[in-house]
UniProtKB/Swiss-Prot annotation:
GO BP terms in the entry: translation
GO MF, one example: structural constituent of ribosome
Lineage, opening ranks: Eukaryota, Viridiplantae, Streptophyta, Embryophyta, Bryophyta
InterPro entries tied to this protein: Ribosomal_uS11, Ribosomal_uS11_bac-type, Ribosomal_uS11_CS, Ribosomal_uS11_sf
Protein name: Small ribosomal subunit protein uS11c
Quaternary assembly: Part of the 30S ribosomal subunit.
Organism: Physcomitrium patens
GO cellular component annotations of the record: chloroplast; ribonucleoprotein complex; ribosome
Family designation: Belongs to the universal ribosomal protein uS11 family.
NCBIfam families: PRK05309.1, uS11_bact
Amino acid sequence: MAKLIKKISLRKGKRRIPKGVIHIQASFNNTIVTVTDIRGQVVFWSSAGACGFKGAKKSTPFAAQTAAENAIRVLIDQGMKQAEVMISGPGPGRDTALRAIRRSGVILNFVRDVTPMPHNGCRPPKKRRV
């Protein structure tokens, strides 16, 4: 006799999210764009590495722009109209990721730079000699 097998759904259904928070983490090696709802639960994320860029190409501004456009495309499908942007990190992709979000048509309530700044904390890494 055949057993009934439960279907396990891996993805949640489409949620309607009118307002959210877009976090851009721009490091020297990669740019990660995470979208959360107002309560802080992650809705979608994208990164330069997840968009197909590998190695040194992940740290380029174009890779950051592609990651931001990828995240925004999913958000517009879920009905997001307004967003707040939090930018963190000193990487080269922070400005181009923000530019891609501005072009998308989502209304930005505010853009905040939340990069942690040390008050003379740990010693930074040495300068590179190439």
